[in-house]
């Protein structure tokens, strides 16, 4: 396919038009008084959002050069969202500011490479300043609530829900978001270990009202193969039944013949038993069975360990205070495992989380960690309409991810103030040459931009507020929601340090690429010939007979 090529100033100008088109659409959402953006959908209701990355992802421009510029900034927003969970709009605003300032200097004849070096040096200095300003969150759930509230577009209800969810399942616990049936937003907590496998036969049910099998102080047999005949199973089944305690069987599968025998015994002699399939697949199944064994103080009966089912003894069975098995889920509460062993297993999983490169694997490992260490909280998001539901879920997701970022690297004063305080660290900083120093100056000017934009969206004059905030010290800043200058930390206006850091690093990275671009190649649009209305001379076919 033929290509079009554009060089030098013309190339950068076209790219910048694309950057501005996308950034101007995204930045209206910044700050507590930021506005919503309505996105048309081909099917269904339009999507209303105040989430920067959602807006960015929807933008495709008709002009190929401009669209390339827009895609560059879209990358900033997406990467910041992936890395820090929030700060997508801030990153977009910073990228636009660095590009605009940098382009003026490059057009005036400055060396793009030297400017990029100056930008990189300044960013490293600002990141140091942000880290120095950060205050750890620890177990202070009030601070967690503040971060969640700000990230959820200043919705105190969502902030409180996330803090409550973290209280219930600890900071490392898994919190998932689901749609509620009604209009209320609530928390549900699944205590203990729950996995998504239910009973193999409805005849195991003990509570017909809830259609659940409930067991108090059961023995738990964990087997990693299929139970195909009852002969191998009897040596452990008989002594377990004689104790009078219920028995939960977790196996890869139970053959229909063996299952029928268990069901018949359950019905005739009130044998307290329930069989479920093992959770997961492949290697993950082995790991999850090992987790269950450690949690319940049992042993996985596996031929890999040299153990056969017929050799199993009562000592190899796990136990727990309570087990509930429904059609789809099995929940084990208060397993009788040794605390030290459980902690050791948790540490092992944490090490795997750090080492893994795959997001999917990391998510699954975090789920396993939560199930071992405390449980899973579910945030049921309720709303009056589907449109509101989508918007609210976006905000809850933002808030949850920002809260995790805050726990990781601490919190800083919000409202763009941390960047303003970082300007002092750039005072008097010089590069190796004049153009590098210009690059440092570009960052110095650009990091004012998030505050200017927050103020502009609140209907005030940015330059005036920036000057007043610069004159203050520490946490003193402008609270756009209440239109008051105050101590932002005390007022609960805080941001995760990680979000501010990642937003600036990603914005500077893409802007640096942009400024050092000398040529843009895009596909040439080919005019498609219109389809002919009909072949000539085909009319008047009446006399064919």
From Swiss-Prot:
- Which pairs of positions does the record mark as disulfide bonds? none
The main enzyme category here is: isomerase
Superkingdom of source: Bacteria
Q: Name one GO cellular component term.
A: GroEL-GroES complex
Any one GO MF annotation of this record? isomerase activity
Give the subcellular location. Answer: Cytoplasm
Known EC number: 5.6.1.7
Entry's InterPro entries?
Chaperonin_Cpn60_CS (IPR018370), Cpn60/GroEL (IPR001844), Cpn60/GroEL/TCP-1 (IPR002423), GroEL-like_apical_dom_sf (IPR027409), GROEL-like_equatorial_sf (IPR027413), TCP-1-like_intermed_sf (IPR027410)
Chief location category: cytoplasm
* Catalysed reactions, semicolon-separated: ATP + H2O + a folded polypeptide = ADP + phosphate + an unfolded polypeptide
Positions binding ATP in this chain are 29-32, 50, 86-90, 415, 495
- Which terms are listed as keywords in the entry? ATP-binding, Chaperone, Cytoplasm, Isomerase, Nucleotide-binding
Q: Name a biological process GO annotation.
A: response to heat
Oligomer and partners? Forms a cylinder of 14 subunits composed of two heptameric rings stacked back-to-back. Interacts with the co-chaperonin GroES.
Instruction: Describe the task this protein carries out.
Output: Together with its co-chaperonin GroES, plays an essential role in assisting protein folding. The GroEL-GroES system forms a nano-cage that allows encapsulation of the non-native substrate proteins and provides a physical environment optimized to promote and accelerate protein folding.
> Which protein family is it in?
Belongs to the chaperonin (HSP60) family.
Its recorded name reads: Chaperonin GroEL
Q: What is the source species?
A: Bacteroides thetaiotaomicron (strain ATCC 29148 / DSM 2079 / JCM 5827 / CCUG 10774 / NCTC 10582 / VPI-5482 / E50)
Q: What is the lineage of its organism?
A: Bacteria, Pseudomonadati, Bacteroidota, Bacteroidia, Bacteroidales
